[in-house]
């Protein structure tokens, strides 16, 4: 929606522009930061009224979402990612304040080797063209700052979704830079050729696509006989039954009211922001387990499918197990 918003703004189609901005804001609260910068860029380019209204809408939504809506829905807690910025504080206000009053901390993080690699891998595929349109590239700046100051390594890894908003600004700046530099047909052809070349080279070097050198590095699951066993096991589970399943199986068992990644709900893991409001084990009718992936959860699993555990195996093949809750059995208590 950010790409469409810019395109519509450049054509002064303000009604549809407002729709695109609304969709962008509805995607995630931090998309508002990019919306603020997009609005300011439009204001600088001469669309002052629309740009400032856009920036105000983005800022207002960000404050409403982070200060009111998320705490209200989370029992008073702010956004969970506030904990991802060690050295800057434990609340949104502290984080922003310390970034402003201690710029050296921000600079130190932003210039580390892995961050410089991140910038290179984001900009090199588009031939560094966005640097020729710095005003538009500002759309990417807030999310880039968030990503490179975060203590979560995946946020400054170009392969993950955390870079999606950054890339929106990068591609918009690429288009604007090429429009500015490619004013003649020859220049446009050269710029397009350079862009295609750098994109293909970067794809081969860094992407997991069929063209990439990383295609066979284990990113994609290869077809194997065990997959037929998994499909057979999944067919055993009724579509409305509550399930707790291994992490590689649970995506295939969603679209139901109760679907948990094992060891949830007995042992609360990756649940909520802080493990609050743990689910009820009584909602689990079936276990669907890949025994090869149990690790330190094996004792819990063996208790559940043991004589007093309450679950009886209905399917077991090649380490894939489906167990159904029996009418009687010992219930394992949830713990955190």
Stretches with model-predicted labels:
Residues 56-60, 181-208:
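Signature aromatic-anchored transmembrane alpha helix within multi-pass, membrane-resident enzymes
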Residues 138-183:
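Hydrophobic/aromatic-rich transmembrane helices and adjacent perimembrane loops
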Residues 289-336:
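Aromatic/acidic, Gly/Pro-rich catalytic loop(s) in extracytoplasmic/lumenal soluble domains
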């Amino acid at each position: 929606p950010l790409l469409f918003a810019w395109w519509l703004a450049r054509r002064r189609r303000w009604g549809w522009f407002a729709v695109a901005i609304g969709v962008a804001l509805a995607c995630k609260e931090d998309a508002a930061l990019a919306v603020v910068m997009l609005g300011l860029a439009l204001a600088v380019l001469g669309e002052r009224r629309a740009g400032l209204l856009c920036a105000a809408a983005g800022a207002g939504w960000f404050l409403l979402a982070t200060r009111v809506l998320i705490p209200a829905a989370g029992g008073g807690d702010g956004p969970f990612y506030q904990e991802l910025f060690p050295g800057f504080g434990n609340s949104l206000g502290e984080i922003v304040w310390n970034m402003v009053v201690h710029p050296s901390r921000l600079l130190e993080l932003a210039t580390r080797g892995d961050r410089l690699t991140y910038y290179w891998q984001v900009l090199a595929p588009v031939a560094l063209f966005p640097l020729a349109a710095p005003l538009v590239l500002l759309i990417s700046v807030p999310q880039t700052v968030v990503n490179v100051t975060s203590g979560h390594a995946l946020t400054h890894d170009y392969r993950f979704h955390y870079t999606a908003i950054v890339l929106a600004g990068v591609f918009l700046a690429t288009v604007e830079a090429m429009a500015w530099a490619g004013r003649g047909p020859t220049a446009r052809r050269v710029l397009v050729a350079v862009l295609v070349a750098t994109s293909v080279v970067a794809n081969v070097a860094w992407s997991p696509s069929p063209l990439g050198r990383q295609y066979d590095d284990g990113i994609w699951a290869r077809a194997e006989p065990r997959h037929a066993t998994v499909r057979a096991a999944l067919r055993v589970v009724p579509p409305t039954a509550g399930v707790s399943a291994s992490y590689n199986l649970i995506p295939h068992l969603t679209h139901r009211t109760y679907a948990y990644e094992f060891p949830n709900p007995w042992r609360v893991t990756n649940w909520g922001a802080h493990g609050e409001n743990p689910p009820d084990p009584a909602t689990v009718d079936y276990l669907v387990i890949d025994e090869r992936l149990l690790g330190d959860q094996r004792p819990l699993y063996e208790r559940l499918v043991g004589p007093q555990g309450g679950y009886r195996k209905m399917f077991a093949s090649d380490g894939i197990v489906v167990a159904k809750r029996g009418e009687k059995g010992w219930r394992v208590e949830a713990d955190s």
